[in-house]
Design a protein with these regions (language model features):
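Long amphipathic alpha-helical scaffold segments
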Residues: 37-82
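A short glycine-rich, aromatic-capped structural motif
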Residues: 73-137, 150-161, 182, 232
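Short, structured beta-strand segments at or near domain termini in extracellular proteins/domains
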Residues: 276-285
Length: 285
């Protein structure tokens, strides 16, 4: 017998245009449904997310609905699909995380006990950790919920936490030169898609969404190799140290589009926690 949920799914799939809010509502209604129904809705949501149709806010909510259902695009650093092979202009041969590290990954890092394992922390990180509240505690209150959807990039992590996560997975943080090289490519692009900056191509303050989006939601913010969100969504901790400060690429949902171009940079204290600052992994291949 066909359920109301499946009937609604069929209606939306056959509609001439995509109603993003309706799709997001369908995703929310699927929570608690049968395994077969969840899988059908999840597959349909991924198909819409991987397109470009729909208003920004509707797509934001669609991505969050997928995150709560279980986003099949996500995997961990131990899986080959997590990484994208890239060769930079200087000949460096790298494997780079397709997306920023997500909330789902960070939750697993904490739940597995790896966050508490001192072997993953540098001496500076241990000194910082002794006086700091851990990420999971800060991410637990109800008011943090809009920023802790599983398929959103993790935010609110300090540089020390990002460093520890990377070390635990046999990786490190990108350098400023590497981040620029990934965005610019051999063509010396100012943005992952080329030039000029275009409205709706990256998740910057102009989108007026007020929080991070699911990773990979902005389909144009993508390099030819398949790296997502290098211009916007969340700013990126980089490995470069300047005394007590660390360099970041500042392009994010909370900053204007001028912060998203390849050569943009900022410096913040290593202990900074911000709702628009995340990180991405890299390793040599």
């Amino acid at each position: 017998m066909r359920t109301e949920l499946m009937t609604r799914l069929s209606e939306l799939e056959s509609a001439p245009t995509m109603d993003g809010m309706a799709w997001a509502d369908l995703g929310r209604r699927a929570i608690g449904a049968s395994a077969a129904e969840i899988e059908a809705v999840r597959t349909a949501l991924v198909a819409r997310l991987e397109g470009t149709e729909g208003a920004a806010r509707a797509r934001l909510e669609l991505g969050e609905a997928l995150g709560h259902l279980g986003d099949p695009r996500l995997c961990g650093p131990g899986e080959a699909a997590y990484w994208v092979d890239v060769t930079l202009d200087d000949g460096a041969s790298l494997q780079v995380g397709r997306f920023h590290v997500t909330n789902a990954e960070m939750r697993q890092f904490v739940a597995s006990g790896a966050y508490a394992d001192e072997a993953h922390w540098s001496d500076g990180g241990l000194l910082w950790r002794d006086g700091a509240t851990d990420w999971a505690t800060l991410a637990s209150p109800a008011e943090a919920a809009p920023f802790t959807v599983p398929n959103q990039p993790v935010v609110g992590a300090s540089w020390w936490e990002a460093e520890a996560y990377a070390k635990a997975h046999g990786a490190r943080l990108l350098s400023l030169a590497e981040h620029r090289g990934l965005v610019r490519g051999a063509e010396k692009r100012p943005y992952p898609w080329g030039s000029p900056f275009r409205e709706g191509y990256a998740h910057t303050r102009e989108e007026a969404l007020g929080r991070p989006a699911a990773v990979g939601l902005y389909r144009m913010d993508r390099t030819p190799e398949g790296l997502f969100d290098l211009a916007g969504n969340v700013a990126t901790w980089l490995g470069d140290e300047v005394g007590a400060q660390r360099i970041i690429h500042p392009g994010s949902w909370a900053r204007p589009s001028m912060a998203s171009w390849a050569k943009a940079l900022d410096m913040v204290d290593a202990g900074t926690r911000s709702a628009d600052l995340g990180f991405r992994l890299v390793r040599e291949r």
